[in-house]
Amino acid sequence: LKFPWAFFAVVVVATGATFTNPLSQTLASHRATYAMNLVSALPQSGIVDVTGVFLVEQIPECKGVTLHQAVQLTMRAEGGAAISTRFAATLWESDDATSMTFSTVNEVAGDLVEAFTGTAALSGPRLGGAVEYTEPTASTLALPSGVLFPIALSRAVLAAAEAGTRLLDLIGFDGGGEDTLTTVSVFIGAHFAAGEETPANGADLLADQRSWHTRYAHYAFASQAAEPIFEVGYRLFENGVITDLILDYGGFQVSGTLETLENIPAPIC
């Protein structure tokens, strides 16, 4: 199982809509944990149970934002065999959305499956650029015009939601291997006013925040495939916090329920 990195990985390109400045949203400096559990599985998937914990830390800094994600899952197959998976990723993205550093690690049963470290730079906002990898080997990946990085992508989706946009055609680079450059179809659904159905364990940071149900279908970049690689859904708050997470791999679905949410003091600039 490869865990999809950066749940905020969506970017608005050539949709005909006009969006507000993506830096206008104030992202909350926070740490959140989620309980992960199997929702459903098709018989052919061979999976009978999934449990685990997902951690997110988002810290706005003086010239950018640091985002850290880590997940530990235990998957049980028919017959009782259990497999543990661990995914961790850290990125730093500049406030002008043109540069990013990243490091990701994916392990299965304690063995390293893949690891990526590198930097990505764009010629300008929504312009093309390149990724320079230092791990696993020194290599370069071209980035197409219109691509944005995860933090800028989150802000762009929030701006689209504020504008009343519901369907978007997207491109995103998440900070990983070549397969994390994806085209994305995003649906922005139900809107919640500030204070409406606020999770009790997140009230301090969420009570005064509007939010939207969102769902993202990720496809291999430039692919004509009819089926996405995976789909992600969650409730997105205007300060960047997410709740009600659903990961859909086709053969099975895993939910993420918010357990804890706390403020992280941001540096004084």
Regions from the language model: what does each represent?
Residues F19-A82:
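N-terminal cleavable signal peptides for secretion/export
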Residues L23-S29, E57-T66, W92-T98, L205-A207, ...:
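A short, structured loop/turn motif at beta-sheet edges
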Residues G52-Q58, R86-E93, A120, V232-R235:
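Hydrophobic/aromatic beta-strand elements that line small-molecule binding cavities or substrate pockets
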Residues Q69-L122:
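Hydrophobic/aromatic-rich structural module bridging two neighboring secondary-structure elements via a short loop
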